[in-house]
Amino acid sequence: THRSFWFSKFKDYPQLLQEDSIIREFINTKSQAAGISKIEISRDSYNAQIIVTIHSARPEVLVGKDGLTLNQIYSVLNKKIANGQKLTINVQEVLNPDLQAELIGDFIVEQLEKRVAFRRVLKLAIARARVAGAEGIKVQVAGRLNGAEIARTAWIREGRVPLQTLRADVDYASKRANTTYGVLGIKVWLFRGEIV
């Protein structure tokens, strides 16, 4: 989903979209250990202020000792994109990381890259989500599973994941794991309940 909250003139749109992409890529590469579930970017109507809100499972890693890491991110982003714009970075803690598809995907990637058997990883991820209160979860892994010659797709679903119901709160994430055998694609669908 798009997590950019701003409008612009037609001619400025590509540049602002590229700025958003630069911000997201930089923050994700700089702070992989912080467990970032989403990055929201909003701008005011005159494009004079950029507000970046980072939702993190481990905000203390993102902020760093005495705010050092966050200050480094701020200064680099200021040089890269802010041409006269005021940049504000907010960090919000994700209270339940096991109910975020993005973080579940990161956990699966981390385990698969450590060469843990894929079926065990999927079952563990599903169990963690169900304990956290998810009503349903579906996880799919595709590629050379356990180093097999022929690539295949495997998935496990527990509970219900209604993808056709509009009021269903379904969180989705797509990840890639770079293993010694090649690239594995991971998809996570997490059903948190219905929005009334």
Which residues does each PLM region occupy?
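RNA-contacting regions in translation and RNA-metabolism proteins
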Residues: 1-196
